[in-house]
């Protein structure tokens, strides 16, 4: 049987570390998940071993709290944005090798404390659903910059199916996600090929004119 739970009873919420881009590097001691990079290269999850775009680093000298460090299967949650539509993006952090990583400014780490009740991957999909995002928007504050406080998120009640049902749902959605990602990459390759081919044709045309 499933159950109804309040998010605050099964998850913890921690603010990310505020570190400017000027102190980010191509190599370093900690992977750093910057808020601005999430919208430009990631969708639903961050795979540390095969990221859809390079993940920057920060150095060990930065002042980072233990609560700001990411663990495998944490959810990187965006609760601050310049538009309401961008609020509530959730990214599952897949880090099976447990590489040192820090969640960045304007992000919140959602960590599942009760894995006997919810699989992190299932919760990530649930938090990305239109129904949940609609509930989240009830708590939006601000005029120019919009925010939802983690304390408000922790009060949201969700209904969870049995763990085995969650595993089946995650398996199906992961399969769809993987196929979608492959198609996106393929479309990107085709677009680059078309641009190159069009440029070649144009050059040949110009040469023939001369």
Predicted ranges, named:
Residues 29:
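Short aromatic-glycine-enriched beta-strand elements
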Residues 34-35, 60-128:
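A short beta-sheet element
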Residues 19, 100-108, 140-170:
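A short glycine-rich beta-alpha junction/loop motif
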Residues 121-152:
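Short, positively charged
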Residues 1-21, 155-210:
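Non-catalytic DNA-recognition/assembly elements of restriction-modification systems
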């Amino acid at each position: 049987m499933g159950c109804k739970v309040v998010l605050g009873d099964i998850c913890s919420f921690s603010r990310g570390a505020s570190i400017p881009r000027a102190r980010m590097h191509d190599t370093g001691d900690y992977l750093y998940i910057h808020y601005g990079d999430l919208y430009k290269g990631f969708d639903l999850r961050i795979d540390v071993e095969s990221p859809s775009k390079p993940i920057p680093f920060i150095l060990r000298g930065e002042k980072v709290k233990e609560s700001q460090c990411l663990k495998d299967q944490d959810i990187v949650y965006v609760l601050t944005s310049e538009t309401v539509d961008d609020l509530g993006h959730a990214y599952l952090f897949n880090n099976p090798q447990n590489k040192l990583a820090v969640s960045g400014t304007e992000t919140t780490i959602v960590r599942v404390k009760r894995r006997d009740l919810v699989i992190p991957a299932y919760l990530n999909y649930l938090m990305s659903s239109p129904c949940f995002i609609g509930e989240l928007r009830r708590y939006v504050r601000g005029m120019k910059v919009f925010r939802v406080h983690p304390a408000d998120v922790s009060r949201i009640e969700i209904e969870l199916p049995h763990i085995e049902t969650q595993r089946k749902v995650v398996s199906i959605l992961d399969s769809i996600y993987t196929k979608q990602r492959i198609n996106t990459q393929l479309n990107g390759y085709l677009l680059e090929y078309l641009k190159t081919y069009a440029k070649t044709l144009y050059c040949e045309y110009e040469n023939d004119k001369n």
